[in-house]
């Protein structure tokens, strides 16, 4: 069983984000697409109502924050800025990272507990794309 390495998965995501074309016009480019993407990814690890407030609070109390320490995000965009930067990005542009992370998890045996009837994978959907 192959051990999943966080840094490998993060580097794959960083490479995909680096290839996303800049969609903004003008000079309003305080945060890069890479910073916004890594910050968005880090939100999955840090459950907090306000990602930015939590990171700033951690920085104030401990002198560092998880976004920088774990994900290499030096300048932390707000939740709204992350959405504004990433909403225009086509999901297919990050497909390589998704499948690479999937492969790491699958090879490491971490997905076995998510098998359903007939050996199929169980997938959680939030329902935002489905209507009755």
Where are these regions (language model features)?
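Dynamic "connector" segments at or just before major functional cores
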Residues: 1-132
């Amino acid at each position: 069983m192959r051990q999943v390495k966080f840094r490998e998965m993060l580097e794959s995501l960083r490479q995909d984000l680096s290839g996303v074309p800049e969609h903004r016009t003008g000079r309003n480019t305080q945060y890069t697409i890479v910073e916004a993407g890594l910050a968005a990814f880090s939100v999955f690890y840090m459950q907090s109502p306000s990602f930015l407030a939590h990171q700033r609070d951690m920085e104030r109390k401990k002198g560092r924050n998880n976004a920088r320490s774990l994900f290499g995000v030096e300048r932390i965009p707000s939740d709204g800025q992350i959405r504004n930067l990433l909403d225009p990005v086509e999901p297919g542009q990050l497909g390589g990272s998704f499948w690479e992370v999937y492969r790491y998890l699958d090879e490491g045996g971490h997905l076995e507990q998510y098998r359903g009837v007939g050996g199929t994978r169980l997938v959680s959907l939030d329902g935002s794309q489905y209507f009755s």
